[in-house]
């Protein structure tokens, strides 16, 4: 798994499993709301009254309705910023 996915996948998976409502802002400013039904490397399925397939390259920001707790995966400090 590439380093770029080491945070993205667990974060999206937590949103999906806990059925946390999200607001997704697209790069063109449009705001979509719903729950993450599924996702893969390129798209997110967002469910509200209908299911929408949203391409990840079009997403600017994902804002959950409440805090998300991610499972601890590397207690040795891996995953922290490398400044």
UniProtKB/Swiss-Prot annotation:
Assembly description: Homohexamer.
One example GO MF annotation: RNA binding
PANTHER family in alphabetical order: RNA-BINDING PROTEIN HFQ
Family: Belongs to the Hfq family.
Stated role: RNA chaperone that binds small regulatory RNA (sRNAs) and mRNAs to facilitate mRNA translational regulation in response to envelope stress, environmental stress and changes in metabolite concentrations. Also binds with high specificity to tRNAs.
Keywords: RNA-binding, Stress response
Signal peptide: none
InterPro entries assigned: Hfq, LSM_dom_sf, Sm
Name of protein: RNA-binding protein Hfq
Entry keyword RNA-binding: yes
Transmembrane segments: none
Start and end residues of each Sm domain: 9-68
Organism the protein comes from: Marinobacter nauticus (strain ATCC 700491 / DSM 11845 / VT8)
An example Gene Ontology biological process: regulation of RNA stability
Pfam family, one: Hfq
GO cellular component: cytosol
Domain of life: Bacteria
């Amino acid at each position: 798994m590439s380093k770029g996915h080491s945070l993205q996948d667990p974060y999206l998976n937590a949103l999906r499993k806990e059925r946390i409502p999200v607001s997704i802002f697209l790069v063109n400013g449009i705001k979509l709301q719903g729950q993450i039904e599924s996702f893969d490397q390129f798209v997110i399925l967002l469910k509200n009254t209908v299911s929408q397939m949203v391409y990840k390259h079009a997403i600017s920001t994902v804002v959950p309705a409440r805090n998300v707790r991610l499972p601890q995966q590397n207690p040795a400090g891996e995953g922290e910023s490398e400044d």
